[in-house]
Amino acid sequence: MEILYQDEMLAVLPPNHDLAKYKTISLEQLAKEPFILLDEGQHSVIMHALAKQQLEPQIEYKVYDDYSILAMVQQGLGISAMYSLVLNGFEEGLVIRPITECPKRNVAIAWQNWETMTLASRNFIKFIRENLPLEIKN
């Protein structure tokens, strides 16, 4: 396995929101605002991070689609927390801020045996290694 990137969870706010004036947002600040949650069942990273600090967010909506959340935040229906890879290219009409005390996730690629891997698989891994950092920056 090779870790390619650490993806950061970020606060997603409408431009006119009171928290937009801050450079970073704490979990405590997030918990006090109407929140739009990506419904990931029991595996929600943001919910685990909040629970670890004994915080309970004001969940207004549970949504199954990342891009629906972005549209809802743009319309001022609440705030959310999403990973940077999801937000890449969709920042217009939103204010994005780092969240203090929030875990990152590893984006990785795994394989069993390089020596027995097909040439196409090896080329794919090489392509990902070379191009993922460029895609993330753009």
Walk through the language-model features, giving the residues of each.
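A late-sequence structural motif
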Residues: 95-137
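Short beta-strand-to-loop elements that line the ligand-binding cleft
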Residues: 37, 56-65
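Paired acidic/hydrophobic, glycine-rich loop segments that form the ligand-binding mouth/hinge
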Residues: 78-83
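Flexible hinge/capping segments at coil-to-helix
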Residues: 1-9, 13-35
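Short beta-strand-centered segments that line the small-molecule binding cleft or hinge
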Residues: 1-9, 13, 49, 69, ...
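Secondary-structure junction motif
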Residues: 33-53, 117-122, 135
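A local structural motif
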Residues: 51-60, 94
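Short acidic active-site motifs
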Residues: 26, 45, 67-68
